Amino acid sequence: MVADAQVSESKTAVRRGRLVVLAGPSAVGKSSVVRLLRERMPELVFSVSATTRDPRPGEVDGKDYRFTSRDEFQRMIESGELLEWAEIHGGLQLSGTPAAPVRRAIEQGKPVLVEVDLAGARAVRAAMPEALLVFMAPPSWDVLVERLTGRGTESAEVVERRLATARVELEAQDEFDEVIVNEDVSRSCDELVSLLVGRPEQSESTH
């Protein structure tokens, strides 16, 4: 019994958590899916991105995003605190992923979700090749345009920039390991849960 317990403890110690990187166009519904995912998977570690944009209604600093100034963001870049970072929508804002919480959670064997843009997904893949890249796509282009313009929270210029960015992102979805078409929030959430916990390491499952 003691030997079995020691073997089990050893396996737990060496198992690394799964890192899933989620990207997709603005207004594709990522936030709604992630919100439901966090309710269904309380053990999930969700990487809180640092961003220089202003909070949207209902967003909480430190929970939804780490809202920061450009000066503070620049300091984080220079001190190597970010796993990835990028200029978003033609330089309107800066966004990045603090590295320490992600690496710590993976070493502890926890499932980790990082939500980034296309450039961020590429950067995480370069830094952590074991990451599983997941692209969330809209049912159609028309649906995406309707969702984005229906927000009513951004100027026409910002909307046009977001649409231009979305075209580039949609053209790059073949770079991702998995594609989820977000027609239904609950179903998309189920697919993410499966990707986060449904593929145990073969080396461990066969022993």
Swiss-Prot record:
The record lists ATP as bound by G24, P25, S26, A27, V28, G29, K30, S31
Name the domain of life this protein comes from.
Answer: Bacteria
Record localization: Cytoplasm
A GO molecular function assigned to this protein is: guanylate kinase activity
Instruction: Quote the catalytic activity from the record.
Output: GMP + ATP = GDP + ADP
- What keywords were assigned to this record? ATP-binding, Cytoplasm, Kinase, Nucleotide-binding, Transferase
Q: Which GO terms describe its cellular component?
A: cytosol
Enzyme Commission code(s) on record: 2.7.4.8
Is Lipid metabolism included in the keywords of this UniProt record? no
What PROSITE patterns is this protein classified in? GUANYLATE_KINASE_1, GUANYLATE_KINASE_2
The record's listing under InterPro entries reads: GK/Ca_channel_bsu (IPR008145), Guanylate_kin-like_dom (IPR008144), Guanylate_kinase (IPR017665), Guanylate_kinase_CS (IPR020590), P-loop_NTPase (IPR027417)
Just give the chief location class. Answer: cytoplasm
**Coiled-coil zones:** none
The Guanylate kinase-like domain, residue ranges: 17-197
UniProt record similarity statement: Belongs to the guanylate kinase family.
Give the protein's biological function. Answer: Essential for recycling GMP and indirectly, cGMP.
Q: Which HAMAP family match?
A: Guanylate_kinase
Q: What is this protein called?
A: Guanylate kinase
* Native source species: Rhodococcus jostii (strain RHA1)
This chain is encoded by the gene named: gmk
